[in-house]
């Protein structure tokens, strides 16, 4: 048998009881707990010495939520930090607000990853060791106005001394709409419109169709069932760590494939990360490389359009030119009075929009420890982001009143990159019960962005002179027509 003795603030002791009649137990202070160190700005500080507002989240807390987004993993973990997703689409953007909305920039906090400014979206949440959130003005005192909305400091997992260790995990999540709206079926729709015309517009020819209770197609379409589905997300993650007394490394790769709850919505994400740390004599070397590729398709219809279309409209109609039901039909030669709605299934089929993004972040740093109390660090960081948006719309009809007469193509490209050079000299020394920390440094940041866009529509304008006046008309045309 073994007795375990523990107390808050002390290291637990395990004592075998076999053959012992008298026990003398001395508990030692748990210095790791009492002197917990948090990352603050360009250095570290004991939590007990902190005077500003700071909150910490460890990796085990982040991993309790099944997500590929490090910011979404923060949701509900810290008081005063609001994490909102822009919509229910797979790959929807996420905003983080610390202590409400501010007036600087886009209200997003500044992200510092392993001591370097970067984009948290390039980090797989399974690669994170801890996150520190600086909420008050102390953050701006270190980073300046760019930290006016707060600072999130991310520390990723380091390599460990020893033989190569490989870990792998995978999980799958299933998403569905919590509750669908109770919409009118075909019979209810006919009755409500009959009442509407009975009260206000008996004179309209389309009124007779509803009055007689005629359903011109026999359709009873539940557009929610047609356009909503069960979403499935699959995630895979592999990590390799190892190293020696001098150098340590960590290499990881993550893949996520999500099919959204809306028809036509999907999101694929690949993350790769390499982190190196080395120590020799008075020199500490660190380097990191993060790479992310995303591909997404977003629905080409709105929820409003989906909920507005009549249940009398069939999804497919072989009598229509493009094979989809339209809100433009007649009964016995009398046009029915339908709202002008789009067939969202036709929009989903004939429109295609793909987004592709490439993120890369690289950093390298060298720290020289001249004395136990004096260190100097120089570093370089590169952040690059390439974004491509491609849209194609065929010639088709989803709304008889607004047909797409000509094919249309659009492409947008953006390439953003920034570079940061930093030099920091830090003095940190204890004098008895007192300690002094001083820092001096400089930071140079350069940023560039290139944008381009092009659009082509399958038509051309022809001009003619009629009765001495200039007239114009649009006709179908190819890319190589004069």
Regions found by a protein language model. Give the residues of each.
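Short secondary-structure junctions and interdomain/linker hinges
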Residues: 81, 370-373, 431, 447
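Surface-exposed loop/interface segments of Gram-negative outer-membrane beta-barrel transport/assembly proteins
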Residues: 48, 161-220, 260-267, 271-359, ...
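Long hydrophobic segments that form regular secondary structure
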Residues: 240, 367-372
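Proline-rich low-complexity regions
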Residues: 109-110, 311, 370, 394
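Short, small/polar-rich motifs associated with maturation and membrane association
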Residues: 1-273, 277-280, 284-290, 361, ...
């Amino acid at each position: 048998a073994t007795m375990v003795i523990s107390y808050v603030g002390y290291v637990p002791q395990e004592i075998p009881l076999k053959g012992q009649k008298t026990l003398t137990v001395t508990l030692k202070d748990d210095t790791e707990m009492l002197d917990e160190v948090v990352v603050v700005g360009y250095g570290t500080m004991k939590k007990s010495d902190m005077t500003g507002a700071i909150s910490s989240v460890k990796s085990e807390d982040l991993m309790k939520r099944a997500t590929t987004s490090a910011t979404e993993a923060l949701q509900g973990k810290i008081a005063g930090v609001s994490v909102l997703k822009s919509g229910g689409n797979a790959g929807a953007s996420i905003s983080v607000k610390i202590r409400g909305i501010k007036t600087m920039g886009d209200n997003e906090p500044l992200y510092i990853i392993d001591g370097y400014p970067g984009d948290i979206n390039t980090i797989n949440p399974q690669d994170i060791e801890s996150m520190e959130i600086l909420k008050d003005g102390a953050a701006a005192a270190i980073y300046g106005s760019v930290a006016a909305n707060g600072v999130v400091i991310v520390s990723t997992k380091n390599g460990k001394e020893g033989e190569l260790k490989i870990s792998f995990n995978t999980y799958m999540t299933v998403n569905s709409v919590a509750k669908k709206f109770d919409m009118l079926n075909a019979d209810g729709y006919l009755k409500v419109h009959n009442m509407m015309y009975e009260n206000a517009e008996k004179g309209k020819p389309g009124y007779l169709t509803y009055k007689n209770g005629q359903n011109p197609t026999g359709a009873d379409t539940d557009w929610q069932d047609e356009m909503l589905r069960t979403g499935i997300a699959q995630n895979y993650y592999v990590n390799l760590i190892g190293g020696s007394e001098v150098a340590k490394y960590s290499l990881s790769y993550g893949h996520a494939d999500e099919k959204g709850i809306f028809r036509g919505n999907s999101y694929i994400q690949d993350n790769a990360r390499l982190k190196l740390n080395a120590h020799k004599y008075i020199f500490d070397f660190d380097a990191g490389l993060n790479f992310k590729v995303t591909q997404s398709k977003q629905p080409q219809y709105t929820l409003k359009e989906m909920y507005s279309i009549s249940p009398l409209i069939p999804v497919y109609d072989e009598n229509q030119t493009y094979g989809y039901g339209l809100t433009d039909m007649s009964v016995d030669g009398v046009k029915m009075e339908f709202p002008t709605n789009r067939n969202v299934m036709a929009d989903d089929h004939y429109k295609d929009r793909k987004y592709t993004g490439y993120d890369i972040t690289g950093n390298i740093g060298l720290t020289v420890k001249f004395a136990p109390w004096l260190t100097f660090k120089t570093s370089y960081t590169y952040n690059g982001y390439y974004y491509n948006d491609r849209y194609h719309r065929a010639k088709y009809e989803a709304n008889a009143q607004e047909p797409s007469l000509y094919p249309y193509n659009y492409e947008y490209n953006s390439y953003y990159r920034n570079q940061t050079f930093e030099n920091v000299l830090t003095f940190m020394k204890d004098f008895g019960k007192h300690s002094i920390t001083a820092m001096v440094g400089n930071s140079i940041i350069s940023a560039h962005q290139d944008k381009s866009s092009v659009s082509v529509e399958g038509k051309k304008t022809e001009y003619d002179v009629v009765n001495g006046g200039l007239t114009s008309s649009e006709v179908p045309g190819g890319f190589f027509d004069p």
